[in-house]
Amino acid sequence: MELEDANVTKKVELRPLIGLTRGLPPTDLETITIDAIRTHRRLVEKADELFQALPETYKTGQACGGPQHIRYIEASIEMHAQMSALNTLYSILGFIPKVVVN
């Protein structure tokens, strides 16, 4: 099954994923997407744990900076970057696969 770039590119955020996944059988693309969903869930959990560990002044925006805050920001960047890739995979695949919660 070849996907039409014209149909996908209107909503895709990460164009390199179109080329990387071009020609893949739908089952392989679904496997990649399911793995990306699981990765995203782990990253969300990690970022949330780091946020919850921040002092209240950081959570409310009254303070910022320092190693602990930087670790949270880096985890959030990683989580959001993964979400962009995941949204692109959803667009290419054409649906959101069901994934059992671990």
Swiss-Prot record:
Keyword Signal: no
Keywords assigned by UniProt, alphabetized: Conjugation, Plasmid, Repressor, Transcription, Transcription regulation
Disulphide-bridged cysteine pairs: none
Keyword Cell membrane annotated: no
Top-level lineage group: Bacteria
Biological process according to GO: negative regulation of DNA-templated transcription
Function: Negatively regulates conjugation and the expression of tra genes by antagonizing TraR/AAI-dependent activation. TraM may either bind or modify TraR or AAI making them unavailable. Alternatively, TraM may bind tra promoters preventing TraR activation.
Name of this chain's protein: Transcriptional repressor TraM
Underlying gene: traM
